[in-house]
Amino acid sequence: MTNTKHSLITPAMKMVICIPSGITEVEERAVRESAEQAGAKEVRLIYEPMAAAIGSGIDVLDANGNMIIDIGGGTSEVAVIALGSIASKKSVQVAGDRLNTDIKEFMRREHNLDIGIPTAEQIKINVGAAVTHLDNPPADYEVYGRDLVHGIPRSIMINYQEVATALNNSINAIEDAVMQALNVTPPELSADIFKTGIYLAGSGSLLRGLDKRINKITQLPVHVVEDPLRAVARGTAIALKNLDKFESLTKY
């Protein structure tokens, strides 16, 4: 009988997989086993903030400390990196997916309008904001959904200030994670961060006014990295292509 099962990966292939810094040993083992079952001969793991830093062009092997915040879909990763290691870190399960849920719940609560997660995502993209005052605000956005009172289709206009209100608690949680990571950062690295500032990566970094809000609470410069959506993927690819250079940054 012909075996119709085929591995997705050639047996000799090495694989570098990005994982959250707050992952448990059980979760880490599950990731590794999944890769091995897929056919990977050698599996390396790299933490998301480390990959984001590499993909953002930060010299992670340098002695100077750099802080990066990677706001992805499921988690927000905050890390201070120096000499190829993570000196301090904080991971919270508040990121893009949670922001979408916040918007969906806000629409139900404040407007009696039921919307789906894809619609919430579009609201976030079009009028999402972390602050209630923007110098260059986006135009109001028309939202379509189901009226919870009458059960019929309905549309309303929503502005960025409403979205900022909807996201406030989740943004607070991200700010708390940043402050916690800063509070346990060694003094020498804190001095470096004071000079270089904080780097923002991931899809959440594109939320309007988030950089200003983090700047306000930390009193540090905040920079959105170039092409933040691909920073983690780009950094993981760079680590894979340069395993000799970045071997110490990955784990078996």
Task: Go through each PLM region and give its residues.
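Nucleotide/phosphate-binding catalytic cleft detector across ATP-hydrolyzing
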Residues: 1-71, 79-198, 205-252
